[in-house]
Amino acid sequence: MANIISLILILSSFLSCSKGKEIKPSSDVFRYIGRFDLTNLEKVKFAHSGNQIEFRFKGIYFEIGLNDMSSGGAEDKNYFSIIINGEVSQVVEGTPFLKYHKILVNSPDSFSSIEIFKRTEALCAVAIFHGIKFDEGEFKKKLAKKRRIEWIGDSFLVGYGNLVSIEAPPKGNPSSGFHAVNQNSYSAFGAITSRFLDADFSCIGFSGRGLYRNFDKSENGTLPKEYSKAYFNKGVEKAYDFSFNPHLIVIAIGKNDFGGELSKPPNMTDSIRFVKTYLKFLELITKNNPNAKIVLAVGGGLTDLTPRNLNRLSRFRSWVKVVKRLSDKYFSNTIGFFEFHSQEPPYGEDWHPTLISQQKLADQITPYLLQFMDW
């Protein structure tokens, strides 16, 4: 009798699995927005904050297959926002092994807009998309937006620690360290602004990275050195084909070059190297995006108040204005300049913007971009 029951359970399990359906990553129902590695269409790889997989779905639920190329530590894992009809419905936690995550839609009679949005940055882990499993339902491709914006930036752009709010000393201590679970690039200023402008969003951002040197004074893996890659992560690299073709590129980098000035004695930032590297970087950007308008953004995380007498914000501003003036002479692209207000407390992790501060950054730059682009 026990053997008969076991056989029935096995057959039942087989029949249940056999009626399931699957859509491979190669299906044309998927829109891949941002930098994706489509070399293997059975396992699509991506790493940057804000990489999106979009489609439309009519049905009750589906399951999305994902895994991380990582050990799964607290700093080395991904989180994904699942957006249904413009609202975040759930958050999926990445795993080092393939896992299918159930996404409840409850839309049996009409198509819903679905977006899988990578909220953690490239430094956390490369993600792999394995496709979708479902029992019943229909899928359609979403139409592309008419506008495309590429954002190039640092920890501010990728939402470092923005899900917490910590008072400045003596009430609190924002020097908390990085935790992937507290990072959400969907609620960072670049993504917020792009949604308001109804533009496809592509993000190339790395915490701690600078123009010619990084926050820790190292010069490996600076933003200009990583820009031409679809992703990089612990020795895994893939060149990018520049297929996004943005109408607008917003560059908000350079703050981390001043990180060495927090040392005692301060390791001063080299103005000549800063300007030369920025111009060389713009040469690369304009070569691959000859028709894009470009905005050079400063501010946000630097002030003239600390460290005393270094005037870091004023120097940063003046150097980028030199870059802008020379760029107008050297490049045919239309180039603008924008300055964010300095952030105020409370802070996210390690003195970064909170959700409220990120919204303020978006509110500041959005009117400027509307005018700059005549949108």
Give each language-model segment a name.
Residues 10, 17-152, 156-185:
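N-terminal secretory targeting modules
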Residues 185, 349-375:
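Histidine-centered active-site loop/cap adjacent to the catalytic His
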Residues 70, 155-158, 206-211, 255-260, ...:
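Solvent-exposed loop/turn segments at secondary-structure junctions
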Residues 4-13:
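Sec-dependent N-terminal signal peptides
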Residues 48-50, 124, 173-268, 272, ...:
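Conserved SGNH/GDSL esterase-like catalytic core that processes O-acyl groups on lipids
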Residues 295-340, 351, 355-361:
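Substrate-gating cap/lid alpha-helix
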Residues 148-152, 157, 201-205, 247-252, ...:
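Structural recognition of the beta-strand scaffold that forms the well-ordered cores
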Residues 278-282, 320:
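Generic structural signal for well-ordered alpha-helices
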